[in-house]
């Protein structure tokens, strides 16, 4: 909470609690003295906290008063967001959330949900925003279902904060000649449900000739997909480059997977916010620009080794 809420406590109430056992004359004197002292302290505290949360006034009042932004996130997507060994939520998005929260004077509270339910949670107001390596697309902006093409809601606005392409990975030493998406025709791929990789696999399968479609198995999260590939239940997997690269680096001590081919479909990750809440959208954009300018953004991106996806400025609805 920012100090302006502390300042709402009146000097009279503060003085009364500290002088309840003295006589009437002493009470009057104490009210004056301690009241002035408390007001001075509040101003000092307020100045310090406002300087630490310079963009608090940009938030909608209800969120500012609550002191919390509820974030819908699929917390099984390392290194973007995941649970460490202690059960703490860590990753690129939580670190950025902490930095944005300092600018806005609120806590970013990450709530776990499967990826394909996050926008629904935003529509139902379960979340204030969704932050989960979500690609900013025109369909999502306009509330159009990626698979059916049907309108399913009012859509969302995105504040874009990172750029990532889609990668293919295979079991290490067993790439089966897979270098491009066309090489997957007649083979099986595992993906996370509702992602760009899932959509791309379906689109590429339609291009396959001779009846050799891509067999696609989708899962609630990438870790489940990786488990299936690791056990030999598929020929390849696909996910956003930061996630695929992290899996290649860490799974089995770097012995399980390898990246194949080049990234495709490079597009922005966006923080999704209801179109009915432009005030929150603009506050998030201002906070993101602030941490880009002060260098905190670059520190976080470098910490996770994904500098190639960094952006130089926040952008609203930059996806295509």
Q: For the regions a protein language model found, what residue spans apply to each?
A:
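A ligand-binding cleft/hinge motif common to bilobed small-molecule-binding domains
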Residues: 134-151, 202-203, 230-265
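Acidic, polar ligand-binding/catalytic clefts
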Residues: 107-181
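Bilobed "Venus flytrap"/periplasmic-binding protein-like clamshell domains
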Residues: 89-103, 135, 164-221, 236, ...
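Bacterial lipoprotein signal-peptidase II cleavage site
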Residues: 33-47
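A structural signal for short loop-to-beta-strand junctions that line the ligand-binding cleft
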Residues: 60, 92-93, 143-164, 257-261, ...
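Periplasmic-binding protein-like
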Residues: 162-170, 241, 249-285, 307-320
């Amino acid at each position: 909470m920012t100090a302006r809420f502390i300042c709402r406590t009146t000097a009279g109430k503060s003085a009364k609690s500290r002088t309840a056992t003295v006589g009437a004359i002493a009470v009057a004197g104490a009210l004056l003295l301690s009241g002035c002292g408390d007001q001075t302290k509040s101003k000092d505290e307020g100045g310090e906290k406002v300087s630490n949360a310079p963009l608090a006034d940009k938030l909608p009042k209800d969120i500012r008063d609550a002191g919390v932004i509820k974030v819908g996130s699929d917390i099984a997507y390392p290194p973007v967001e995941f649970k460490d060994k202690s059960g703490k939520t860590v990753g690129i998005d939580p670190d950025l959330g902490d930095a944005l929260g300092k600018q806005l004077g609120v806590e970013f509270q990450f709530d776990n949900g499967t990826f394909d339910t996050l926008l629904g949670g935003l529509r139902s107001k379960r979340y204030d925003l969704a932050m989960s390596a979500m690609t900013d697309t025109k369909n999502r902006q306009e509330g159009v279902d990626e698979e059916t093409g049907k309108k399913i809601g009012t859509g969302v606005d995105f504040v874009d904060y990172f750029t990532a392409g889609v990668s293919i990975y295979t079991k290490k030493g067993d790439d089966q000649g897979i270098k491009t998406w066309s090489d997957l025709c007649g083979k099986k791929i595992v993906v996370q449900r509702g992602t760009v990789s899932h959509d791309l696999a379906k689109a590429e399968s339609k291009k396959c000739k001779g009846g050799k479609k891509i067999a696609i198995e989708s899962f609630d999260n990438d870790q489940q997909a990786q488990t299936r590939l690791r056990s030999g239940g598929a020929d390849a997997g696909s996910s956003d480059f930061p996630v695929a690269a992290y899996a290649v680096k860490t799974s089995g001590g770097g012995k399980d997977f390898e990246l194949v081919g080049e990234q495709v479909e490079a597009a922005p990750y966006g923080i999704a916010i209801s179109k009915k809440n432009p005030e929150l959208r603009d506050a998030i954009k201002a906070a993101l620009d602030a941490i880009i300018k002060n260098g905190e953004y670059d520190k976080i991106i470098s910490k996770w080794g994904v500098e190639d996806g960094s952006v130089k400025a926040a952008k609203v609805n930059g996806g295509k």
